Amino acid sequence: EPGGSPDPLYHKRNGEIEMGKTYIFGHKNPDTDTITSSLVMANFERKMGNSEAVACRLGNINKETEYVLNYLGIEAPELIEKVEDGANVILVDHNSPSESVENLENANILKVVDHHKIALNTSYPLFYRAEPVGCTETVMYKLYKENGIEIDEKIAGLMLSAIISDTLLLKSPTTTDEDRKAVEELAKISGLDPEVYGLDMLKAGTDLSSFTIDEIL
């Protein structure tokens, strides 16, 4: 049950409960999907009973993401550069060690939620969810729905922003019906107009403020 007993994935490999924080982060040179996914996944983990989940980032926030966080009134994730040996981590929006945190090879990877090709090898089993969709947040949207976890207005805004960013307002060739369905639902929950808000967001990340949406896309 959401909010009930901790997820069994929080057992260490030797069967003992691992105390301490769970660090959740996306790739280096973070984009909007990476930053929002860490925040959305941390919220998901807390709702699932992991009170130690912490959203992190591996680099500076770009202008587009800054616009999103300011618009929604949400603080940026904590900046980290490396993790200690044995630290519990969850990877979002990436799985390749070369794009990840320093010392990942000595961390305890609990979960991966992603939409990229698989480049990760571990010597132990873990929860791995990757789908061929346009954005990690589309996968996160499905995880919330499957687990009966409420998507509130701000979480919906984060998810929506990332899908708009990664799929360029659903116009990128990587866009799938899953992404379109998520955007439709998340627009209702967040109260944001994907076209109007999305264009403002994309403009904020560029110096294309004088161009129309058709010229940009």
Residue ranges of each PLM-predicted region?
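Short, positively charged low-complexity motifs
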Residues: 1-7
